[in-house]
Amino acid sequence: METTTPSSALETHRDRPESSPQDLEDFVVEFWGVRGSIPTPGQETIRYGGNTSCLEMRVAGKRLIFDGGTGLRALGDSLAEQMPLEAYIFFTHYHWDHIQGFPLFTPAFTPGNCFHIYGAIPPDGESMKKHFIERVLHPNSPIPLKGLQADLRFYELKAGDSLQLDDGIEIETGQLNHPNTAMGYRVTWKGRSVVYCSDTEHLPDGLDDNVLELSRGADLLIYDAMYTDDEYHNPKSPKVGWGHSTWQEAVKMAEAAGVKQVAIFHHDPTHGDDFLDDIERQVQAVFPKAIMARERAVVPVGG
């Protein structure tokens, strides 16, 4: 393991075969975990899913994984027949719901696999690798560091950094408004782009310029819309300052940034399928190309 610094039409997938080489030649997003805070299995979350944050971008023959919530376990299991493999993992931040799937990510235990792991320098100034490992391995899980047999390479990022992968894949970063900080990502390839902004809270006096600039003209904006406006401002239990936003603010940002499609993401654990269906109707009434993030849903990007 090493730490380095880098240079500056929704389709359900539950009954679909595992991704083919042709899939990897294009640009698609697949959702593996769409919840916030805590996994929520049960009868009320069957249609949207109960795993915490994890999504995969397959672009130009490469796998880019964003966040490692409990959805990462299922993603890892789906890759079991494709080893050895190389992939890139990007973390927005290190709260539990974005890292708790890593100790159950089977490919990390397999010799011959290689993972390039990117994340922000922690607020306390310690190395990203140390900060990450201490949270996902012993004593917080029974897994010792030596159990991870894959080649893990760590790269530290600062908000505003950008990097180039092979085949013309560009990745840009931006600061998000979240306790202990978080980082948003924009992935661009052949003029098509996806922006991933989770977790982030809108500002009280206008749009967040960091998110706005990162999102301008994107084909798809995946946005933290954990609450409704009514929940966010509820005088009995306000959510102001908790680091999350609303679907109404997602629409405002999408319209201001001129994005083509917005995905409502990071669903509250109390929001069951019927509640999310109702949000979908409301958001599509004002932004027809909006979608609700669902586990195992695949979204083609541009094209």
Regions found by a protein language model. Give the residues of each.
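Cap/insert and terminal regions of metallo-dependent hydrolase folds
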Residues: 201-295
